């Protein structure tokens, strides 16, 4: 049985406020759409994933989807959701899937069990829709005043995926051409296709506003696996009149000696990220014996580690780095360092701490021979 996923991501939703379309906004360090695509691309029963996008979003889609398996070339949507789904179905027709799951690109927290339940329902039904049976009391109103209670035993709150036998939903959309249906179950019902309801998931929310992104982040924090990594680095002082620390150029009466720019702070954070995902250390990825990295800015190393973390399904929750030295003074530069680290990792500055301490004159740092950095990074997987 060949199962395809059709992800509808051609909208321009204005409720999320100014900026990128909601499906390309960052959710805990990753674009919303990437999380949606990954949920289907990583599902063992899904064979292909086709995305319907807005013509202006080709570059954004490429950036958001890079490296994911099973993805077909996206197609452009139309002026309505119905038009966009029709375009996607016509494109999938050449691939001849048996089943198709149609899902909102702005629902990034769809779970594997709900996907599986929708597919399973198609063994006995032409269509299936995820949804939530209502538990709250439902009441009609009359001019703002409470009126009669509505029986809730037949009421569901609709979600996606909406899953169908492929030929049935393609024919239904062709029959509905020019109509104004708001979802695919409506299209199916109009064509006489019977659709079963499948219990969905409370966490399968649709991102329509900034508040929804905050709610989704809370859900991810609650449900994800926590990983912690520890990094430590040392560099000695040498000739120079500045040092690089945590991505910031700091004036000093000496420089730091190293193969790259000797930024001990970023090196420690890089090792912490790599350690949290079990990817070795900075030397494995950027060996000091390679002249390519001579004098290289250390932000390259941290950005690479962050990319590996993203590919492993992880996101950075927070970073805590301690710089150990007598001089230079870190306090005046700490805020700029926090901002630079946050920018490299694509997280909020409030998730980054930079602080300094001394060894009270003891050891090589106490003698002013060099400095050290220690970093702890917390990642959330899931």
Curated annotation (Swiss-Prot):
It comes from Parvibaculum lavamentivorans (strain DS-1 / DSM 13023 / NCIMB 13966). Bifunctional enzyme that catalyzes the formation of 4-diphosphocytidyl-2-C-methyl-D-erythritol from CTP and 2-C-methyl-D-erythritol 4-phosphate (MEP) (IspD), and catalyzes the conversion of 4-diphosphocytidyl-2-C-methyl-D-erythritol 2-phosphate (CDP-ME2P) to 2-C-methyl-D-erythritol 2,4-cyclodiphosphate (ME-CPP) with a corresponding release of cytidine 5-monophosphate (CMP) (IspF). It catalyses: 2-C-methyl-D-erythritol 4-phosphate + CTP + H(+) = 4-CDP-2-C-methyl-D-erythritol + diphosphate; 4-CDP-2-C-methyl-D-erythritol 2-phosphate = 2-C-methyl-D-erythritol 2,4-cyclic diphosphate + CMP. Its cofactor is a divalent metal cation. A divalent metal cation binds at residues 233, 235, 267. Keywords: Isoprene biosynthesis, Lyase, Metal-binding, Multifunctional enzyme, Nucleotidyltransferase, Transferase. The record marks 15, 22, 259, 358 as: Transition state stabilizer. 4-CDP-2-C-methyl-D-erythritol 2-phosphate binds at residues 233-235, 259-260, 281-283, 357-360, 364, 367. Pathway: Isoprenoid biosynthesis; isopentenyl diphosphate biosynthesis via DXP pathway; isopentenyl diphosphate from 1-deoxy-D-xylulose 5-phosphate: step 2/6; Isoprenoid biosynthesis; isopentenyl diphosphate biosynthesis via DXP pathway; isopentenyl diphosphate from 1-deoxy-D-xylulose 5-phosphate: step 4/6. PROSITE patterns: ISPD, ISPF. This is Bifunctional enzyme IspD/IspF.
């Amino acid at each position: 049985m060949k199962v395809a996923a059709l992800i509808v991501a051609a909208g321009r939703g204005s409720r999320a406020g100014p900026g990128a379309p909601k499906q390309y906004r960052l959710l805990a360090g990753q674009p919303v759409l990437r999380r949606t695509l990954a949920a289907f691309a990583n599902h063992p029963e899904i064979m292909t994933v086709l995305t319907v996008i807005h013509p202006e979003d080709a570059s954004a889609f490429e950036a958001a989807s890079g490296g994911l398996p099973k993805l077909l070339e996206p197609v452009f949507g139309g002026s309505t959701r119905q038009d966009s789904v029709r375009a996607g179905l016509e494109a999938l027709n050449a691939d001849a899937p048996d089943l198709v799951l149609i899902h909102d690109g702005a629902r990034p927290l769809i779970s594997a069990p709900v996907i599986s339940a929708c597919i399973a329902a198609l063994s006995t039904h032409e269509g299936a829709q995820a949804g939530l049976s209502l538990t709250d009391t439902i009441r009609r109103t009359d001019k703002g005043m409470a009126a009669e209670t509505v029986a809730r035993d037949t009421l569901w709150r609709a979600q996606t995926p909406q899953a169908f036998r492929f030929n049935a939903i393609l024919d239904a959309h062709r029959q509905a051409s020019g109509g104004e249906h708001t979802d695919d179950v409506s299209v199916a019902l109009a064509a006489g296709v019977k659709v079963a309801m499948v219990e969905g998931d409370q966490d399968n929310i649709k991102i329509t506003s900034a508040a929804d992104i905050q709610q989704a982040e809370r859900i991810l924090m609650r449900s994800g696996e926590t990983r912690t990594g520890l990094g430590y680095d040392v560099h000695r002082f040498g000739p120079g009149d500045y040092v690089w620390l945590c991505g910031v150029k700091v004036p000093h009466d000496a420089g730091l000696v190293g193969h790259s720019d000797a930024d001990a702070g970023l090196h420690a954070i890089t090792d912490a990220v790599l350690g949290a995902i079990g990817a070795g250390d900075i030397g494995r990825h950027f060996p000091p014996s390679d002249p390519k990295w001579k004098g290289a800015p250390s932000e390259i190393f941290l950005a690479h580690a962050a990319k590996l973390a993203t590919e492993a399904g992880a996101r950075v929750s927070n970073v805590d780095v301690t710089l150990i030295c007598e001089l230079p003074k870190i306090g005046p530069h700490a805020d700029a360092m926090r901002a630079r680290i946050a920018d490299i990792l694509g997280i909020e500055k409030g998730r980054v701490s930079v602080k300094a301490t001394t060894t009270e004159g003891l050891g090589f740092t106490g003698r002013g021979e060099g400095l050290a950095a220690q970093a702890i990074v917390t990642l959330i997987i899931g």
